[in-house]
Amino acid sequence: MSYETISIEKQGAVDWLTLNRPESLNAITTKMVTELRDYFGSLYENESVRIVVMRGAGRAFCAGLDIKEGSARKNEGDYVPFGGGMGFQGYLAEVYIRMRRCPQPIVSLIHGPACGGGFSFVLASDIRIAGESARMNAAFIKIGLSACDMGSSYFLPRLVGTSIASELMLTGKFIHAPRALACGLVSEVVPGVELVNAAKPYIADMLRTSPMGLRLTKEGLSMAIDAGGLEAAMAIENRNQLMCSRTNDAKEGMRAFLEKREPVYTGS
């Protein structure tokens, strides 16, 4: 499908996904959700894309839900997605599930506000780099809702610990770039104009890995976080490592190491 609220720029094996409603600080609309569901859903079967970089156009990463659209929908009886019986709530929630399910690592470049559902885009990513202007919050609680929404209660405690997650979610206060770096929420903080350049070393390092090795590392991490214990986590590791070890790329990686050269992976 063609997209109106997001844009995809393909650079080799890397997709640069831009939330593209700058006039509304990239606020989330039903159309944006439809497009994000389509895009992230398609990645599961897309072998040519190895990495996704997610960012926002204009002054913000994503200001969260477009409240104006939501109010209009309620007042005018506009179409509401089924969302598994949960309406728009379930419809949007599926985006974050697809972000975690897709085998491609997602790198988020955050500048300006990332609020509510926009904050959850950040949390559902695999690597986060913040511009100096970045500020993030679980904004739901500020508008009479629970802060536990769109995966935030799952992701945030795992990233920063229960204590900081409780503080941020119970108050709705912003966490700014310096503190986000200090508590491990982001990998680094750079001037906003340097965000793209800051992402390039991460991208280059990941592109030097084998395609299957990269995919199964994301999958293994996601599964191990929820594993019942060490043995369950190691069972996942053993399964994935056995699969990787039987590929031609694994043989090439070992040959290249012994021959002191860069490996040439073919994805086989």
Where are these regions (language model features)?
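Short, charged, surface-exposed hinge/linker loops at domain edges
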Residues: L221-A227
